Amino acid sequence: MLPAHRTEGEGFSLPQFDLTPCDVDGFLDELQAFHDQFRGCFSRSEPREHCFNYMVGQCSALERKSIEPMALHVDGGNIRGMQRCMSDDVWDEDTMRETYHALVANEMGEPDGVLIVDESGFVKKGMESVGVARQYCGTLGKVENSQVGVFAAYASRHGYALVDKRLFIPEQWFSDAYAERRHKCTVPDEVAFHTKPQLAAEMVRAIRSEGRLPFKYLVADCLYGNSPDFLDAVDACVGVTSLVAVPAETRCWLQRPLTTEKTYTYKGAVRAKRVLPPETQTPLTGAALAQSLASACWYRRMVSEGTKGPIAYEFARKRVTLCKDGLPNRTGWLVLKRTLGSSPTYASYLSNAPESTPLRLCVW
């Protein structure tokens, strides 16, 4: 089911679903039919049934959706059984994910689908859950005691769905001081610290390698656009066009500068490194480049529907070469966005789209 949306030039509005009592009346039967497609992922019937009851509890109107209130709410619920299912029982996660991806592809898969990478935080009151820490929680927009997950979603003209996830475990969790907590949370010994962009890169590689979800485009926010690990994983997806936010201080050249090789001696060995000639122009930041553009370079576009009416921005783009460690790096489109008014604010996005790509492909 898709939300009502504007069809020409203005993107999605606020989601509006037309549900009838008949839609709700048949929900449990549909949920059971959905769950039955994963029967082969469980080795025993008990965890399979507890998993279904857990799903029912998550879809309920309960205010607190922890194990005990959910188990007491659903028919046939068992508190210890549901707790054991979530903490101790084993199921085939790879087969479950592959089965789910096949369902998503069948329902909404398109060759020009979009893969979306982002994170989300979950506020926690206690300190017992794995990965919980005082960290930035995007749900609240501030540092809070929380868990953070990195997620991948799939979208097409037929709908959208979450398709993968990774739990971010903060670096301090891998220190000796947290050894007891890791053991209590049964964190496997082979699990090591990974940054959020590294976790996102894992998902992109896995989804691409699996091959069940067709996608032609990939989008992500600034945290991932500023990560070489993530960008390398995206670039490895041949034929995929990406658009990722990058920091305003990202430096770039409008023309790729030439480099020369300089030799030097280090500990008796002759080595070489690439350097820029002295006359090379200083790279610009994305913000400085945006502010230097004439008004005629900007294109106004309605992007969404707000509570007070349509929301519009102005966009421009330039072909640039990024600066990394003082040297030229990857080349692509720098898509620039600014707010309307006399004192605009700017945002920058990087795309690996071909040179012939029109701006309207990046702004929709």
Locate the predicted segments by residue.
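Basic, short loop/linker segments at the boundary and entry of helix-turn-helix/winged-helix-like folds
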Residues: 24-52, 183-187
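An anionic, glycine-rich sequence signature occurring as long contiguous blocks
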Residues: 32, 158-185, 189-193, 243-248, ...
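Structural motif
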Residues: 42-50, 140-145, 340
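Electropositive nucleic-acid engagement tracts
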Residues: 43-54, 58, 62-127, 206, ...
